[in-house]
Amino acid sequence: MNLENSSIQALVKLIDDPDDSVFEHVRGKLIQFGPDAIPYLEQSWENDYYGLIFQTRIENIIQDIQFEVIKNQLLEWTASSEKDLLEGAIIIAKFQYPDLDDSQIYNSIQAIRKDIWLELNDNQTAYEQVKIFNRIFFGMHHFQGDTKNYYSPVNSCINVVMESKKGNPLVISLIYSIIAQKLDLPIYGVNLPNHFILAYMDD
């Protein structure tokens, strides 16, 4: 066992310290270790029962670590020149689903892209291409708004929306534009007051 691992284990054992100043110091150190501390925290949560306060503190520390990871990834994403929409959507979804498999989302996006690509050709007008896109995206793959649980947080998580085919208008539009741009169709989001719409931006 290396020094870092032993330090994490020692800190985890101090989580139930009744002195708030000690706990805050321990919490800060564990957050600094980042995701490397999570397996030790989860193991202690499962195997060591020192009461409800102990377990609640562990849960909160894990959430704090995950939040810091997501925050840093989003800061890097906003600072990047590319600002890949799919990557950004996955980062946001990982706040709710930290263990989600990126490859499943990429593969699902690629499969839909292929279905549409097979029916497109250069002789079609923009209107015809969008009509084909809509038929496959909404008709074949059944993407639609979630009218029953419109305000559910999971409707903003791209992994859930890709699986259920239901989500809020923003994420449905996001997925639509991601696939369109992968097909070299110039469809981009336009942020209007209280609305987010898509537009075909043909120069």
Residue ranges, per PLM feature:
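A structural boundary/capping signal
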Residues: M1-D203
